Amino acid sequence: VIADGGMTTSGHITKAIACGADAVMVGSPLARAREAPGRGWHWGMGAVHASLPRGERVRVEPIGTLAEILLGPAHDASGAVNLTGALRRAMALCGYETVKDMQKAELVVMGG
């Protein structure tokens, strides 16, 4: 299972893994790296209309280097930086040591 669609913070990634995702598409976070080739632009693949071509060009503001985005350190609590460290911390807080264990987390779904 590959989770895609609006994955912009470490919280989104953590929830996708807990729901069983094997991988997570993170176009927006990677596009926010200073060294990203698109310089803040990326091609979002959301379907705008069923009969029209998929996707749209999306602009995001650079927030740090690729290493900072993936590995930290985080300078704020937005969840946009240190994605792997935040996932590891969330797994530890939930009592899981591996991604495979986290993928089997018991979930509670509440209606609103």
What are these regions (language model features)?
Residues 1-3, 8-112:
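Alpha/beta catalytic cores of nucleotide-metabolism and tRNA/nucleoside-modifying enzymes
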